[in-house]
Structure formats: C-alpha cells, structure tokens
Curated annotation (Swiss-Prot):
Residues 143-153 are annotated as: Flexible linker. Residues 64-142 are annotated as: Domain II. The gene is ruvA. Gene3D superfamilies: 5' to 3' exonuclease, C-terminal subdomain, DNA helicase RuvA subunit, C-terminal domain, Nucleic acid-binding proteins. One of its GO terms (cellular component) is Holliday junction helicase complex. Belongs to the RuvA family. It holds the Pfam family RuvA_C. This is Holliday junction branch migration complex subunit RuvA. It comes from Listeria monocytogenes serotype 4a (strain HCC23). Has three domains with a flexible linker between the domains II and III and assumes an 'L' shape. Domain III is highly mobile and contacts RuvB.
Length: 201
C-alpha cells in the first residue's frame, strides 16, 4: 500500500498525470489533472490511494490528505465507485460538499456526475455526522462579532465556528453549546462529532 509519491510531474492529460520517481513513471488518476499544471517539470508530493481489482491496479492521486480521506469515505457508500468518488471531489473544495451532506441537501449532491437522487440520499445516510475530521482541518476560522462563543475554550470555539460555517443556525448551536461546555478537555473534532450527534437526535 502506498501513502504518497514524491517525484517530478512529467505528463498531464485530461484523465491522469505521470510522476517520475526512481526512473519509473507512475500513472496517477486525479480528479482534475490540470490542477497540477503549475507543478509540471518540478518535484511534487502526491497522496495516493491504490485500488486493486482482478484485472487492474490503479493509483488515484490527491493534493491533500483531506481529499483522500473524503474519497475513501465516499467509497464506503453503496453505489459509489472510485471514478464517481473522484468526480465528486474534483472541485477541490470539500467544505460545500460536507455542508450539503450535513444539511441533507440532496439537490446539491445530484449535480455531480453519476449521482442521482437515490445515491445522494445514500451518501447522506452513510456519511452525515462522520466527516468532522475533514471539517476541522479544512474550514478557515474567523473571529465572530457576536458573543455566542464568548467564554468558551479554544477547542469548543473552533468547533462552534466550524459548525456555523457548515450552515447550522445560531439557534441550533445555542441549544447544544451548554451541553458541549460540560464536556471538558475534548478536541475540536470531538466537540464537532458530539454536537452533530446532539443535533440529529
């Protein structure tokens, strides 16, 4: 199993890139190969997922570990294969995608190739509340102008702002903040997971 490859990007096509490492050229399928165009001819690090079938071994490449994590989560959904999962995250912006899953916005999800209404509902059913790790690492936090997070620990404040960025209302968050505040010494990820559990009860 490969974790990443570091080498020279030698070729970019509409479907894949080629990274040369140790005098071997590795063909790596990516969601948007042209996002690597600025790296052509230079050394790059690409995070990998190896997909093995009876008749084929493929390498899928990602620019961040968060993209790869989300890709693997999508693969766990019934009806989603590697090509479909890659197409879903091809935009490179995972926050709106996670927000759609958490808010059960199946209309947003059906805009992706090969994702119909049934598959969109399956994605929501399987992944809602399970993507806190990606949320915490991808969202840029901005200090709020209200007092909703005043007096909270840095970890809880970060979690609340992440949930707010995902579209949860102030009213929803204020309902769960007192319960979250009772839990001390949790990480931001743990607070997010707990909040999602409380809000989906």
């Amino acid at each position: 199993m490969y974790d990443y490859i570091k080498g020279t990007v030698t070729t970019i096509t509409p479907e894949y890139i080629v990274v040369e490492a140790g005098q071997i050229g590795y063909q790596i399928i990516t969601g948007n190969p042209f996002s690597f165009q600025r790296l052509e001819g230079t050394e790059a690090q690409v995070f990998l997922y190896q997909h093995v079938r009876e008749d084929n071994i493929s390498l899928f490449g990602f620019q961040t570990t968060e993209e790869r994590y989300l890709f693997k989560k999508l693969l766990s959904v019934s009806g989603i294969g590697p090509k479909s999962a890659l197409a879903i995250i091809a935009s490179g912006d995972v926050v709106p995608l996670i927000s759609a899953i958490e808010s059960e916005d199946d209309v947003y999800l059906t805009k992706f190739p090969s994702v119909g209404k049934k598959t969109a509902r399956q994605i929501i059913l399987d992944l809602k509340g399970k993507l806190a790790d990606v949320v915490a690492s991808e969202i840029v936090y901005v200090a709020p102008e209200n007092d909703m997070v005043a007096g909270l620990s840095p970890q809880l404040e970060e979690a609340v702002l992440a949930l707010e960025a995902l579209g949860y209302s102030t009213r929803e968050l204020k309902k769960v903040i007192p319960k979250l505040a009772k839990e001390e010494d949790l990480t931001s990820d743990a607070y997010i997971k707990l909040a999602l559990q409380l809000m989906t009860k």
